[in-house]
Amino acid sequence: MAQQLYFSRDSKLYAEFDNQVWEIPVLDGFSFSQSTNTSDITLAEMQGSDGISRRGRRLFTDSLAPAEWSFSTYVRPFYSGSEHHAVEEILWAVMAGADKFGTVSSAGSIDAVALTTDTATDREQGTYVVDADDTTYSGSAGTGATFQISVNSSGTANAIQVVSGGTDYTASETFTVPAALVGGGTGTLTVTISTVDAGSSYAFYRNANVDANSDFGEFVSMPTDTNNSINFGQSNRSVLADLNLYFVMETSTSKPMVYKLENAAVNEASIDFDVDGIATINWSGFAKNIKDRQSAGDVIANTTAFSSQAGTVGQIHLKTDSDMQFSLFTSTGTGTGVTAIDSGVDSTANFIRNRLTQAIVSTTDTAAFGSGDYYLTLTGGNVTISNNITYLVPEELGNVNIPIEGVTGGRTVTGNFTCYLTLDTAGADKGSSVDLFNDMTESGAGLDKVVNDFQVTFQIGGATSGDPRLYINMPKVHIDVPVHSVEDVISVETGFGAYTNDFDKADEFVLTYYGDTTTANQVSYP
């Protein structure tokens, strides 16, 4: 009898959430597994009068352990002509607390702003990310906006762009920005809203038990014509929404193997950006069970169009003459289900080159950190976001217990970045890596800070408008003393952790995706 083998290089991954399915290309090295938890009993007694000492062991299966999975994806933003999205955004949304996906109104999200002419000439040159909550806002309804303001070498603020558009704003409303947020100097800045979005977007949001403390309202991911800002404002809860993952091995077109990871929880995402690579995210998490859908008879593989294919709820249809197009029956009938969204999957224009990545490190505490702003050219880095999930498994005797659900622990945002050891020959406090080390280790200054307060932004892929890129903005960051690494070129590695001043809010960081807006590289969604 012939035996069918399956190869990892023939594999694809699909994610099911809220009656919709997305295709997510993964890299080599993905894994998923599930084992059992066992206990053993051993005998250990002394020798009897007959010279016999009983020795033995008995094993018991206590429970089925939760499934563990991991895979890597590239960071792949794209632009649909009206909205910015990312191939992997479904994973972020579930990790960040969303429980719904659909078309929602994006009215009031800021599309464009104008910066009133700045008369100051004494601001510190640099790029500053400003949260609207730290400004004086002329309106009352808007929330969640973030801007990036640039100060030129003349000490004048001369450029602004929207990082996060927020919600419920109105054109002509203003923000008065304190000088301390834009390099100090003379006078405040005024930012005026030019236009706001009036349409609708395919968004991920929180529907049940919305956390009113979130600065971003119910929205977790709100794509607009400007960008796609993803926040964790709805993630302050003990149990997050889950999704189903499908690993499809297409080695055989007649008998493709499909493993379903039920009730999967996204635990950790680690973003890596080394100088010679493509921006990558390493994902890991848990699931309740791993089910073989092929052996269960729930995989239909043929050339029939899904709209004409009959099936029952939960069955999977793979169209063999259309690159094994994945469809899922959400109810029993003919064509009663959804076909996987594959927007951006086939594009070659949405990969991000790490070599263009920039880091902006700044603080308003110039008494302790004399440079205030540090301009660091990176050679690599990492940001890791973790929900620290543990899976609950009962421990009843006499039963093989089954995993119940994952429970979150403390949310952590940590990472590191590396750069060459550089000294600005023009003098001290010029924002070089040497200045950062000296400021952090100087007694009576940075060394005396139990908790230091930096704002850190990684511009992965650079800052050129229209190019694919990902910004990671962390408003409050505690930075460790840089560690020297002695190699051919001396470098320093700096660890950090983002934190919040208000434990009622999940505001440690915001991710902002920008797709390639070149007309030829736009793709439809969904």
Regions found by a protein language model. Name each.
Residues 108-202:
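Conserved, function-critical positions that sit in or immediately flank catalytic
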